[in-house]
Amino acid sequence: MFTDQQKIGAMLSAMGLFFGFLGVLLFLDRNLLALGNLLLVSGIVLILGLQKTTKFFAQKKKIKGTILFFFGIVVLLVTRWTFVGMVIEIFGFVNLFGDAFPIVISILRKLPIIGNILNHPLVNRLLQKADSGNELPF
């Protein structure tokens, strides 16, 4: 079903998210955030392949998110402004992968523990407001 390259890419992406989360928990540790970014991007390349990854990041409607995501990585690596780099990078990440959030939420709702939390009336109402797209969730 999945090739070995895609399995390695999924693991690298998961490790990238883990190291990024750990970098945020450790008060924006620059080295862990940089390692997380490197692993996440290389994992995406291995999952999709180089040609599809280039095609994904170069889409006309996603070019703003691509520029912000990679500019945030550059700010994080080159300067000492880790917080600014993370904010820029997260904004770019949301612009790039925001279309997939409803799919991820519907998958998470089917999981045993997380599904119960997401189906709670307060959380469910918040997610429905965020999904409508025309109003803020708060």
Swiss-Prot record:
Lumenal side: 29-30, 83-87
GO cellular component: cytosol; endoplasmic reticulum; Golgi membrane; membrane
Disulfide cysteine pairs (residue numbers): none
Single Gene Ontology BP annotation: retrograde transport, endosome to Golgi
Location(s), subcellular: Golgi apparatus membrane
Main localization (coarse): Golgi
Cytoplasmic side: 1-7, 52-62, 109-138
Keywords: Golgi apparatus, Membrane, Protein transport, Transmembrane, Transmembrane helix, Transport
Bilayer-spanning residue ranges: 8-28, 31-51, 63-82, 88-108
InterPro entries: Got1 (IPR045176), Vesicle_transpt_Got1/SFT2 (IPR007305)
Transmembrane helix is among the record's keywords: yes
Topology of the protein relative to the lipid bilayer: Multi-pass membrane protein
Protein family (similarity comment): Belongs to the GOT1 family.
Database matches in PANTHER family: CGI-141-RELATED/LIPASE CONTAINING PROTEIN (PTHR21493), GOLGI TRANSPORT PROTEIN 1-RELATED (PTHR21493:SF9)
Annotated function: May be involved in fusion of ER-derived transport vesicles with the Golgi complex.
Protein name (database record): Protein transport protein got1 homolog
